[in-house]
Amino acid sequence: MKRLARRKIVFVIVEGPSDETALGITLSQYFDNDAVYVHIMHGDITTRKGVNPKNIVSKIGNEIKAYAKSHHYKSANFMQIIHIVDTDGAYIPKENIFEDIESDDLLYQDDGIHTNNKDKVVIRNKIKADNLDRLRFCG
């Protein structure tokens, strides 16, 4: 008996449900003959504690492997892997991060980022930029 060919999977990694809502339908239309699966990371892996340029590729790979294993897929079933991230100001110079003690949260303005903890944002941005730079050269 002839087996029907399975559709190839376009595995799209996003940070949260709002990203899936915003992009899922559009991506499904773009890859109309392919199965699009939008994987929600529930957070930003590029700033997750313990994630660095040396291990970020394997951390993302583990997410993909877990999905493949749970659905009995092999690497040949995947057509493409797309990781969509927002930069969150990762490449903004320190000079454009402003200490604002009255700010409850990060406030992105035309002149830069306003925060009540400049040092924390500078460190976060450095970690994120380093991880994003590593991911740029994958696949």
Task: Show the residue positions of the predicted features.
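Acidic, divalent-metal-binding catalytic cores of TOPRIM
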Residues: 1-139
